[in-house]
Structures are given as structure tokens and as C-alpha cells.
Amino acid sequence: LDKYPDDAIQAGQAIKTVDDANQAIIGIYAAFKDASLYSGRLTLLPDLQTDLVYAVTGYSNQYGDLWRWNILATNEDIEAVYGALYAIINRCNFLLDYIPGVQQSTTDDDALDKLEMIHGEALFARALCYSELIKLFCNSYESDGEAENELGVVLTSHYDSVDNTRRASLKDSYQFVLDDLELAAEYLKIDENSVSKDDLYSTTYINEYTVYALRARIALYMKHYTEAIKYSTKVIDSGYY
């Protein structure tokens, strides 16, 4: 008999309702707390490469190669960061692929509003992961012309992608992030009349101004300083932070 495991869900049945989509986005939020990401290596390893850390006599040489800037291609800590970021991208792609189907089968306006917010959160999460990958594994962005000939990252926009896994250009990689952020900002647009200053300041969820903050950071990476000022000013002038 061809039986499916009792403790698993077939991919095609995983996201059928808005509640399913909400559970998926909660899982994406939780994935950022992975020991290889913001609860560990992604924040720890860069610190080890700065003057914030000094190796004393008798230390165990843990992370010693990173501290000495003698990093081999076989470094497992670097591999873990890379893999964890792409794992979240994969989860975002899975959710984003199924959102249109959920939207078609949903008639309640409040549920559709919730789904739109989830859509924006997933787009932001994917953009954030790609921005980290670009920052860590690509050369710096010097100009639009040079970026066309620099290697970027492997871009995937669908869970079951059959595209060749070749690296896009640095320019195209950044454009992918910008496109995701632009769409995310539309889905996460805040109704100024329905949210309080304190609620938005203390929220732990992605919102319109989270998108603008990352957009400003990306502009800095790209040396588009006017854009960086534009989007950072949106956050500052909002009065929420």
C-alpha cells in the first residue's frame, strides 16, 4: 500500500485556508530565531571579525579561523548561515505559491485583509534573507554598470522551481529584493486611523515602516544615498519610532 505518514501533510494540502497561511508565516518568523541566524551565527560571526573580540591565552580556538580571517570554503558555520537563509526563502516561496489559491476560495473581507498582510510579511521575509545573502556572499555594489558584471546570488521565486540554479548578477539580485519590498509595502500599508502610536512602536510584526527601514538600508548598500534618505525619512517622520 502507498500510505502517507500520519504525522505529515501532503504539500498540496498544507495551505488551504487563511489560518493555514497564518500558521505558515508564524513558522517563518520563528525560523529567524534559528541558531544560525539572528539568535546565533549571523550576529556572532561578524563580531568575531572585528575589534570587539580579542583571543586570550588558553582559549579553545573555537571560531579561531574566523577571528584570524583565515576562512576556508569548507567552514561549517558559514555553510549553516547560508543554508538557514535559503531555508527561509524556500518556506516563503512555498507560502507565496499557495496564497493565490487561498485568496480565490476566501470570501470574508476580514480574512482577505489578513491574507494580504501575510502576503506582505512573506515578501519582506524573502527580501530580508536575500539582502543578507547579498551582503555576506557578494562583492560590494559600486555602481549600476559594474553591478551588471558582478556575481550576485541564486534567485528563486517559486518553491518547485525548475530554473537553472546559476547566480544572477549583483544588479539583478538587488532588483529582486527591491521588487519584493515594493510589493510588500503595498500589502502592509497601515491605516493611520486604526492604529495607535504605542501599538505600532511595540509591535513584533513586520509592517509598512519595517519595509521602509530595510529599503533605506538596501539603498545604502547600493550607494543610492538620495533613496536612503527618502526611505529613512519616511520612518523617522512617521512619528511612530
Q: What residue ranges belong to the model's regions?
A:
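Residue-level signature for tetratricopeptide repeat
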Residues: 129, 216-218
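Residue signature of alpha-solenoid helical repeat architecture, marking inter-repeat boundaries
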Residues: 117, 150, 172, 199-202, ...
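Conserved, well-structured interaction surfaces
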Residues: 61-137, 168, 186-188
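Membrane-proximal, proline-rich intrinsically disordered regions
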Residues: 1-47
